[in-house]
Every structure is written in C-alpha cells, then in structure tokens.
C-alpha cells in the first residue's frame, strides 16, 4: 500500500521573527491554535526515550506545564518510561498537529520535579483520575480488565472516607529542559518551514 501526503499552505509563512518573544510564547500560541481548531488533546505529545538496553521507545503523554524552564508531564515513577529515564535521563518530544500542518520537536535533559510541584498538580486532578493512579501499577501485566476494575474498586473503598486522595508514593512529574526546539510548518512542494531554537540562537533550516 502506498500513502500520499497532505501539504498545508493556507497560513502565513513561519519566520524567525515569530520567535521574538521566545519559543515558549510561540509553542503556547500553537497549542491554543490547535485547541481552537478542534484538535483533540492539543497538548498531547509523543515522548521518546531510550530503554535500559539501548532501544528506542515512544508513547503519547500530555504536557501539563510549559515555561522557560521546560515542559512538564506526570506519570508513575515505576512505569516503563520511568525506567528508561532512570537509565538515560534525556528525552525528546513531538507535538503533532496534523490538521494544521504543524509540529514542534523538543529535546533535552530530564529530571523529576519537586514534591510540591507534584502536589500542586495532583490537587487539580479529578478524583476519579486520582483513584485511577492508585489503582494501576502502570506497565505491569494484569490478568484482565475485570481485575483492573477490581483494583479500582478496592482503592475507591479505601479512600471513601477521605475528603482528599493523597499522592501515591510512586507518582510524580518530570521536567524536560529544552536544549533544542524546532518548529515545523508544512508548505507546498515540500518546501516546509523549519525554525530551530538552540539556546539564544534562532535559525531557519532547509526542509
């Protein structure tokens, strides 16, 4: 089977002056643009890591915070991705907005966020999501979905009399500090726009 491509050419050309206010401001704008365009989970990003035996691995996670220090996501610290990051604390992420013909690629060193940062985010999660984090031993095998739902029922009963569900001991956030950020915008004839930010240097790349 052969696949074609869709070229987007309906928006102004991406240029270096779009980054006058920094890469964070432009990334926020593009996430907002995706949300306004009806993209499901506009803050979804593909996280790429390296397994302890040196193999690539990727999965989709949600960007939950974005500022000049980098981007933050949250997960189970006993998950496969956490094992990867313990072995190689460096990662890459890609925000793919196919409907808009845009993507942003970012990579850099990864570190765990503070307990306070985790607590602040945890307090904003719906109770059901909090209970789900307690119920799931992420990346571990389980016999059936029924068994998973039974684990959820058990933790729901456990915290039934608790006004507040505490943060699980093995759960928290990671911060990816951006070494390199690249903005990509599809154009006709495959002459796509690429702008790379490395520290204070902003430069256009050939497609």
Curated annotation (Swiss-Prot):
This protein's pathway: Cofactor metabolism; pyridoxal 5'-phosphate salvage; pyridoxal 5'-phosphate from pyridoxamine 5'-phosphate: step 1/1; Cofactor metabolism; pyridoxal 5'-phosphate salvage; pyridoxal 5'-phosphate from pyridoxine 5'-phosphate: step 1/1
Family matches, as InterPro entries: Pyridox_Oxase, Pyridox_Oxase_CS, Pyridox_Oxase_N, Pyridoxamine_oxidase_dimer_C, Split_barrel_FMN-bd
Cystine crosslinks: none
UniProt key word rRNA-binding: no
Binding site for substrate: 64, 121, 125, 129, 190-192
Cofactor note: Binds 1 FMN per subunit.
Enzyme class: oxidoreductase
Swiss-Prot/TrEMBL cofactor(s): FMN
MF term (GO), any: FMN binding
Top-rank taxon: Bacteria
Membrane-spanning parts: none
Catalytic activity line of the entry: pyridoxamine 5'-phosphate + O2 + H2O = pyridoxal 5'-phosphate + H2O2 + NH4(+); pyridoxine 5'-phosphate + O2 = pyridoxal 5'-phosphate + H2O2
Enzyme Commission number(s) of this protein: 1.4.3.5
Function: Catalyzes the oxidation of either pyridoxine 5'-phosphate (PNP) or pyridoxamine 5'-phosphate (PMP) into pyridoxal 5'-phosphate (PLP).
UniProt subunit comment: Homodimer.
Full protein name: Pyridoxine/pyridoxamine 5'-phosphate oxidase
Source organism of this protein record: Mycobacterium avium (strain 104)
């Amino acid at each position: 089977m052969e696949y074609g491509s869709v070229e987007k050419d309906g928006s102004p050309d991406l240029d270096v002056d779009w980054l006058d206010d920094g890469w964070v401001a432009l990334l926020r704008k593009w996430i907002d643009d995706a949300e306004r365009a009806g993209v499901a989970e506009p803050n979804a990003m593909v996280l790429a890591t390296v397994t302890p035996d040196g193999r690539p691995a990727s999965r989709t996670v949600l960007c939950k915070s974005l500022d000049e220090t980098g981007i933050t996501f949250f997960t189970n610290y006993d998950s496969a991705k956490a094992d990867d990051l313990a072995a190689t604390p460096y990662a890459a992420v890609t925000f793919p907005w196919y409907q808009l013909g845009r993507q942003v690629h970012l990579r850099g060193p990864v570190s765990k966020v503070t307990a306070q940062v985790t607590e602040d985010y945890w307090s904003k999660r719906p109770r059901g999501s909090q209970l789900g984090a307690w119920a799931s031993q992420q990346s571990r095998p389980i016999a059936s979905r029924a068994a998973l739902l039974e684990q959820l029922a058990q933790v729901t009963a456990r915290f039934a009399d608790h006004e507040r569900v505490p943060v699980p001991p093995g759960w928290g956030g990671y911060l990816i500090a951006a070494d390199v950020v690249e903005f990509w915008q599809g154009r006709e004839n495959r002459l796509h726009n690429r702008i790379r930010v490395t520290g204070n240097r902003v430069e256009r790349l050939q497609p």
